[in-house]
Swiss-Prot record:
Function summary: Transcriptional repressor that binds to the brassinosteroid (BR) response element (BRRE) 5'-CGTG(T/C)G-3' in gene promoter. Regulates positively the brassinosteroid-signaling pathway. Mediates downstream growth responses and negative feedback regulation of brassinosteroid biosynthesis. Promotes growth. Modulates ovule initiation and development by monitoring the expression of genes related to ovule development (e.g. HLL, ANT, and AP2). Negatively regulates the abscisic acid (ABA) signaling pathway during the post-germination stage.
Any one biological process term the GO annotation gives: regulation of DNA-templated transcription
Protein source organism: Arabidopsis thaliana
Induction cue: By brassinosteroid (BR). Up-regulated in response to abscisic acid (ABA) via epigenetic regulation on repressive histone marks (H3K27me3) mediated by JMJ30 and JMJ32.
Note: Phosphorylation by BIN2 increases protein degradation and/or interferes with the nuclear localization.
Location of region: Disordered: 1-41, 102-151
Annotated knockout phenotype: In bzr1-1D, weak dwarf phenotype with reduced hypocotyl and petiole lengths and dark green curled leaves when light-grown. Increased cell elongation in the dark. Hypersensitive to brassinosteroid (BR).
Compositionally skewed regions (Polar residues) per UniProt: 102-121
Tissue-by-tissue expression: Accumulates in the growing region of the hypocotyl.
Protein name listed in UniProt: Protein BRASSINAZOLE-RESISTANT 1
Annotated transmembrane regions: none
Organism taxonomic ancestry: Eukaryota, Viridiplantae, Streptophyta, Embryophyta, Tracheophyta
Intracellular or extracellular location(s): Nucleus
Modified residues (Phosphothreonine): T177
Length: 336
C-alpha cells in the first residue's frame, strides 16, 4: 500500500510540475488570438462568396483553404487527388516518385527552373567583372575553339593574330579600379595637364625655328617693287596697337621678311624701320657697296654694282645730310 501510494503521489506531483512549467497565456493574449481568427475567417468567407458568385466554383458551404486551392488547380488544368497529389493532366507521376517527401522535385514541379528563367546561366554571363574576380573564365586569344559559329570574326582564327601577343581577356563589365596585383595600380600613368602640353609645344616650336638658316626681321614698310623677285613677302598680320582705334581701321600691318644669311650683316640688308628697333641689332660693318652708295650725289639714277638702277614711280633717289635740315616754327623759311 505504501508503495502504491508513493507511486500515485509522485505521479501527481510530476503532473502538477508539468502544468506549472507551461506558461498560461494572459487574458489580453487570448483576446488578441480570438480577434485575429475572426478576421481571418471573415476574409475567407468573402473570398468564397466571390468565387461562388462570379467564378462558377463548386465550393461547399463550410469549406477551408484546401478546397479553394483544389478548385483553382482544377481550373488551371491540374489534377488534385483525394490525398493531395497534384499533377498536370496526362502527366501522372510514378508511384516511386509519389512516395517521396513533399519537397521532392518532380519533372513537372513548379520548383524546376525553366530554360527561359533568368537564373539560367547564359553562355556569356553579363555579370562577370574581370578575369581575376570572375568565376567564369572569359574567352581568350590563345584558347583553342573548334566552334566556328561562336567566333565573332572567323577570319581571325587562322593566322590572323600573331602568337607572340599576350593572351587577351575580354570582359563585358564597366571599367573598374585595377586590383592591387595589377602593374598599372602601382605605377599609374600621370594624367597630362595644360602646363605640360604647353611646355612640350614650346620646345617643339623652338626646335623647328632653330632649323631655319635665315633670320626673321619685322618690318612695317612694304618691300620695293624692284626687290619683290628677291624676297618673298608672306601673308601679313595686324600689328599690335594699344590705342582705342581698331587695327583694321588704322591700317597698320606688320609683315615678316626673310633675309639672306650673310657674314657679316651689311647695313643695306637690315631694314630701316622703327619696328626693327625691337629686334636686337646685329653687328654692322661698312661694306664697299655702302661706301660707294653714300658718295653718289643727287641724281635720278645711280650705279649699283656697275649697273644702272632706276627709281620706281614716285621715288627720288637722293641723300640728305643732317646739316641741311633745320627745325622751323611755322615760318616755312629755311636757313640762308
Amino acid at each position: 500500500m505504501t508503495s502504491d501510494g508513493a507511486t500515485s503521489t509522485s505521479a501527481a506531483a510530476a503532473a502538477a510540475a508539468a502544468a506549472a512549467a507551461r506558461r498560461k497565456p494572459s487574458w489580453r493574449e487570448r483576446e488578441n488570438n480570438r480577434r485575429r481568427e475572426r478576421r481571418r475567417r471573415a476574409v475567407a468567407a468573402k473570398i468564397y462568396t466571390g468565387l461562388r458568385a462570379q467564378g462558377d466554383y463548386n465550393l461547399p458551404k463550410h469549406c477551408d483553404n484546401n478546397e479553394v486551392l483544389k478548385a483553382l488547380c482544377v481550373e488551371a488544368g491540374w489534377v488534385v487527388e483525394e490525398d493531395g497529389t497534384t499533377y498536370r493532366k496526362g502527366c501522372k507521376p510514378l508511384p516511386g516518385e509519389i512516395a517521396g517527401t513533399s519537397s521532392r522535385v518532380t519533372p513537372y514541379s513548379s520548383q524546376n527552373q525553366s530554360p527561359l528563367s533568368s537564373a539560367f546561366q547564359s553562355p556569356i554571363p553579363s555579370y562577370q567583372v574581370s578575369p581575376s574576380s570572375s568565376s567564369f573564365p572569359s574567352p581568350s586569344r590563345g584558347e583553342p575553339n573548334n566552334n566556328m559559329s561562336s567566333t565573332f570574326f572567323p577570319f581571325l582564327r587562322n593566322g590572323g593574330i600573331p602568337s607572340s601577343l599576350p593572351s587577351l581577356r575580354i570582359s563585358n563589365s564597366c571599367p573598374v579600379t585595377p586590383p592591387v596585383s595589377s602593374p598599372t595600380s602601382k605605377n599609374p600613368k600621370p594624367l597630362p595637364n595644360w602646363e605640360s602640353i604647353a611646355k612640350q609645344s614650346m620646345a617643339i616650336a623652338k626646335q623647328s625655328m632653330a632649323s631655319f638658316n635665315y633670320p626673321f626681321y619685322a618690318v612695317s614698310a612694304p618691300a620695293s617693287p624692284t626687290h619683290r623677285h628677291q624676297f618673298h613677302t608672306p601673308a601679313t598680320i595686324p600689328e599690335c596697337d594699344e590705342s582705342d582705334s581698331s587695327t583694321v581701321d588704322s591700317g597698320h600691318w606688320i609683315s615678316f621678311q626673310k633675309f639672306a644669311q650673310q657674314q657679316p650683316f651689311s647695313a643695306s640688308m637690315v631694314p630701316t624701320s622703327p619696328t626693327f628697333n625691337l629686334v636686337k641689332p646685329a653687328p654692322q660693318q661698312m661694306s664697299p657697296n655702302t661706301a660707294a652708295f653714300q658718295e653718289i650725289g643727287q641724281s635720278s639714277e645711280f650705279k649699283f654694282e656697275n649697273s644702272q638702277v632706276k627709281p620706281w614711280e614716285g621715288e627720288r633717289i637722293h641723300d640728305v645730310g643732317m646739316e641741311d635740315l633745320e627745325l622751323t616754327l611755322g615760318n616755312g623759311k629755311a636757313r640762308g
